A protein has these predicted regions:
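Catalytic cores of alpha/beta
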Residues: 73-81, 119-129, 176-192
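Conserved anion-binding
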Residues: 16, 74-75, 85-169
Length: 221
């Protein structure tokens, strides 16, 4: 099964964002990942509405929005109108996550939940039947360049067992290196949000990196 490769555009070169999008698109990435932050749920600010518009305008690939914001349900229609294909919410930021996920589905958009390192599986298990994607944060959300939190692997292993019943895809986000991609693929992870650890700021061209990341497991075996 081919891995889902998702560049985190927060790590891209903003001086030439359009060129970055076009190169990543032609390199064969699967989903463009956009981090939206409000400075409240996480102590940082991410990409804005104009960034989402520019990305959507320059690619036909899937685009997701990771809403690291308070009350995400209030913004579902806004991001749906911008043309995103997948919306992730953090359930702990929403008084009514079931309603918000239903609102996402009603707009014919894929629904996802993002799980912080400190969020328990028990607290989100009732949402699993109604989501398409579960994104596990392997760092604390809000900043690039953090170290991978190994204790999260236990949570990933539990989700791999649960997805056999509920049929969602498992994504991981945070300090994802090539080595981690190989190991996490073996655990049963479907896709990877990639930043500076594996994709951006390298001397290689994106097309060469993406090709290798999609095939690294087969080469290792």
């Amino acid at each position: 099964m081919e891995r889902i490769i998702c560049p985190s555009l927060m790590c891209a070169n903003y001086d030439s964002l359009k060129d970055e999008i076009m190169k990543l698109d032609s390199a064969g990435i699967d989903i463009f990942h956009i981090d939206i932050m409000d400075g409240t749920f996480v102590p940082n600010f991410g990409m804005g509405i104009q960034d989402v518009q520019a990305i959507r305008r320059n690619t036909n690939k899937m685009v997701d929005s990771h809403l690291m914001i308070s009350n995400p349900g209030e913004y579902v229609d806004l991001f749906a109108d911008l043309g995103v294909d997948l919306i992730y919410i953090h359930p702990e930021t929403d008084m009514h996550p079931v309603r918000t996920l239903g609102k996402i589905k009603a707009r014919n958009i894929l629904s996802g939940i993002a799980i912080n390192p400190g969020t328990s599986i028990e607290s989100i298990i009732e949402l699993l039947p109604i989501v398409d994607y579960v994104m596990v944060m392997t760092v604390n959300p809000g900043f690039a360049g953090q170290k991978y939190l190994n204790f999260v692997n236990d949570k990933i292993e539990r989700l791999v067992k649960l997805k056999l019943e509920y049929k969602f895809k498992i994504m991981v986000d945070g300090a994802i290196s090539e080595e981690k991609i190989n190991k996490l693929s073996d655990l049963g992870v479907d896709g990877f949000i990639l930043g500076t650890s594996a994709l951006f700021g390298k001397e290689e061209e994106y097309k060469d990196i993406v090709k290798r990341l999609k095939t690294i497991k087969e080469e290792a075996n």
